[in-house]
């Protein structure tokens, strides 16, 4: 049974993490990440919030990492488009960004410290929804953190797009809450992958033919 996720307090200048299940560091652990940004362009926009959660390979939550709000100057915040100003204003994130003293470098160091407790370097793919976008920002503003992940991504949006095309009725069964905060978006991504695993990716009984084929290609 999956361990439920509970909302950890957002951090502004120092990071803490909440361990929800006693478990060991493992090559098979999955690291989930989400960022909120001022826009879509790493060249012009900046990171304003980042959160991290670790699960095992069965999507059971092992640890909830720091939720970090990153300070950005007013000129960066004033440059946001109407959608971002409205979304991050309603969530209260803009006010938190203005009050925060955490820099991108401090956030990167805190996240790396947390990550190293749960997975070795280059073992976990970066997990999330449309995670390539987060990775672009991370490569620019938190390159040491980006380099700690495996080069592969585990992108739930891939299954979303396949499900919409192959099993549209199943795709309609998962309704996103669209909260647009880093931690809430991670929770939703994990829940979404659990949903696809249960309803879209079916466990098929192993046939003798399949077992023979697997044995023939095994190293």
Swiss-Prot record:
Keywords, comma-separated and alphabetical: Cytoplasm, Exonuclease, Hydrolase, Nuclease
Catalytic residues, chain numbering: 151
GO terms (BP aspect): DNA metabolic process
InterPro entries: Exonuclease_RNaseT/DNA_pol3, Oligoribonuclease, RNaseH-like_sf, RNaseH_sf
Cellular location(s): Cytoplasm
GO molecular function: 3'-5'-RNA exonuclease activity; nucleic acid binding
Function: 3'-to-5' exoribonuclease specific for small oligoribonucleotides.
Family: Belongs to the oligoribonuclease family.
UniProt protein name: Oligoribonuclease
Organism annotation: Ralstonia nicotianae (strain ATCC BAA-1114 / GMI1000)
Phylogenetic classification of the source organism: Bacteria, Pseudomonadati, Pseudomonadota, Betaproteobacteria, Burkholderiales
Underlying gene: orn
């Amino acid at each position: 049974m999956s361990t439920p996720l509970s909302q950890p307090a957002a951090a502004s200048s120092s990071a803490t993490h909440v361990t929800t299940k006693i478990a060991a560091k493992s090559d098979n652990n999955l690291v989930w990440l989400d960022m909120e940004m001022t826009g879509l362009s790493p060249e012009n926009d900046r990171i304003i919030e980042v959160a991290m959660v670790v699960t095992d390979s069965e999507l059971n939550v092992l640890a909830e990492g720091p939720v970090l709000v990153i300070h950005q100057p007013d000129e960066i915040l004033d440059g946001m488009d109407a959608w971002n100003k409205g979304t991050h204003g309603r969530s209260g994130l803009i006010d938190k960004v203005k009050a925060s003293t955490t820099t991108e470098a401090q956030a990167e160091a805190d996240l790396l410290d947390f990550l190293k407790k749960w997975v070795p370097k280059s073992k976990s793919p970066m997990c999330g929804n449309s995670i390539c976008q987060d990775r672009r920002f991370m490569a620019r503003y938190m390159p040491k953190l980006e380099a700690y992940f495996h080069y592969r991504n585990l992108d739930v949006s891939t299954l979303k797009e396949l499900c919409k095309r192959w099993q549209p009725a199943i795709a309609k069964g998962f309704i996103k809450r669209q909260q647009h905060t880093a931690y809430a978006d991670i929770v939703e991504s994990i829940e979404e992958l659990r949903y696809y695993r249960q309803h879209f990716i079916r466990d098929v009984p192993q046939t003798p033919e399949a077992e023979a084929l697997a044995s023939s290609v095994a190293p």
